[in-house]
Amino acid sequence: MHSTNLLLEEPIRMASILEPSKPSFFPAMTKIVGTLGPKSRSVDTISSCLKAGMSVARFDFSWGDAEYHQETLENLKVAIKSTKKLCAVMLDTVGPELQVVNKSEASISLEENGTVILTPDQGQEASSQVLPINFAGLAKAVKPGDTIFVGQYLFTGSETTSVWLEVSQIKGDDVVCVIKNTATLAGSLFTLHCSQIHIDLPTLSDEDKEVIRKWGAPNKIDFLSLSYTRHVEDVRQAREFLSKLGDLSQTQIFAKIENVEGLNNFDEILQEADGIILSRGNLGIDLPPEKVFLFQKSALHKCNMAGKPAVVTRVVDSMTDNLRPTRAEATDVANAVLDGSDAILLGAETLRGLYPVETISIVGKICAEAEKVFNQDLYFKRTVKHVGEPMTHLESIASSAVRAAIKVKASVIICFTSSGRAARLIAKYRPTMPVLSVVIPRLKTNQLRWSFTGAFEARQSLIVRGLFPMLADPRHPAESTNATNESVLKVALDHGKVSGVIKSHDRVVVCQKVGDSSVVKIIELDD
């Protein structure tokens, strides 16, 4: 296993830890995905979330209908315009998730050593004696002695709000369980997780397909979070489905690894998916506690070497109800960054948490501090060694741009790209400075109308560590041919100056295509 990329060669002066951090336009290189819900769906709150550092908005269809989420999305669009901050949209599928709907929303008290029946009869009311579930095949999937976890949707892991059950007997379609700990289940939706048991339900359900078709396609979602990805075929089938929905052929698929099946098929899934979400909540139930860190470090390393974004979930659960994270959570966020995470995904913390904006802000600050002690030199050498020789042309250009930027202490790398691939390859080498990804739009036609590409590519870089996109004006050349022409490069430099990442006399590394050649050049700015 590869060690954490922590810079320890230079002794840190302990008193320097107490010095205030310098303000920055970019809160952190590590991106933050926020789940929008009851506590975070107003225009004002979303605007504050964007300013605090949220770059991807997640819409979770495990609860709420399309109309509810559409209202939230419209508020997001207003917030984007008012803050002038780009934000991508992620749709999270339900998949083969086992659920208990608590129609009355009354709290359900369960006592240790008592019994409760899990039944597929959804006509029954949820109570301390019976929990109706959405899966008729549970009695055939489990056996006496198996463990089942039940918690509030997006559970925080608190033993007082979640319960462990042990299967004691099967009665027809019903499963009788012994309660292992006293708990009170609160809320309208509970989820069940059967430890290391195969659930015979499709990864992309008919309900998921309907939501994608009727909500995802009209809204041109940037990412599809494929819940409970178990096999590489799950990703292929989802991609085939998206390819038939017009613009969604460009939507990136992030495979959500939530159980042992996904873990066992991780390498094949990684090759096919556009990115990976490590769903540590459910996976933490399937794995022994002492093995969770090993999975995280190994999975993140594999994602890094493949150059695919990796997202870590469940980091500051306690901030759902508290203004500050625990010491363990603060350390966990930092370690996720040092392990190689591209983004941190916040679930309950922003969906129903009391402090969504503060949570995003604090997580961003922790990420920024961790990035300062990331051993980029060690990481760079390891990545180059893994890529091997001969490198592809694009890989060689990307690694050279990063090495040059570090050697000359450049303040930023500017990369001109159409597909976004060149910028993502630069980000793969984890430069210590921001990468300004200037997306050059391309004109395309279907014989009936013209349209520009580029918006998808720009937004999809919002989940990649260190990439900050801007859409270029297609009327301007990539570089001016004379002093009077306004070039895209000048616009990019001006954007960097306004953002505060570029100052007078700074050095900037530019990566662009000139004719058929790819060029890396270093420019030094005048006053």
Swiss-Prot record:
Binding of substrate occurs at: R58, K256, G281, N282, T313
Species of provenance: Oryza sativa subsp. japonica
Q: What is known about what this protein does? A: Key regulatory enzyme of the glycolytic pathway that catalyzes the final step of glycolysis, converting ADP and phosphoenolpyruvate (PEP) to ATP and pyruvate by essentially irreversible transphosphorylation.
Keyword Ribosomal protein on this protein? no
Annotated InterPro entries: Pyr_Knase, Pyrv/PenolPyrv_kinase-like_dom, Pyrv_kinase-like_dom_sf, Pyrv_Knase-like_insert_dom_sf, Pyrv_Knase_brl, Pyrv_Knase_C, Pyrv_Knase_C_sf, Pyrv_Knase_insert_dom_sf
Positions with a binding annotation for Mg(2+): E258, N282
Alphabetized UniProt keyword annotations = ATP-binding, Cytoplasm, Glycolysis, Kinase, Magnesium, Metal-binding, Nucleotide-binding, Potassium, Pyruvate, Transferase
- What is the protein name given in its UniProt record? Pyruvate kinase 2, cytosolic
